[in-house]
């Protein structure tokens, strides 16, 4: 779990909040929360994963053909 500790000479809340937000984003807490907000059947998860892989492949192929 991300956490921010303040130094003795650090009293600025905005800086601490910014550091905390950065740590939360880096840890992927919000995206994980959104993903787990509703139950998703394993078959739907597999379909989404397969579709994302196909999309990445097509994007990679388009990029290779263009440049």
From Swiss-Prot:
InterPro entries: Ribosomal_bS21, Ribosomal_bS21_CS, Ribosomal_bS21_sf
GO cellular component, one term: ribosome
Keyword terms of this UniProt record: Ribonucleoprotein, Ribosomal protein
GO MF terms, alphabetically ordered: structural constituent of ribosome
Pfam families: Ribosomal_S21
GO biological process: translation
Gene3D superfamilies named among the record's database cross-references: Ribosomal protein S8 (1.20.5.1150)
Chain coiled-coil ranges: none
Family of this protein: Belongs to the bacterial ribosomal protein bS21 family.
Protein name: Small ribosomal subunit protein bS21
Species: Oleidesulfovibrio alaskensis (strain ATCC BAA-1058 / DSM 17464 / G20)
Taxonomic lineage from the root: Bacteria, Pseudomonadati, Thermodesulfobacteriota, Desulfovibrionia, Desulfovibrionales
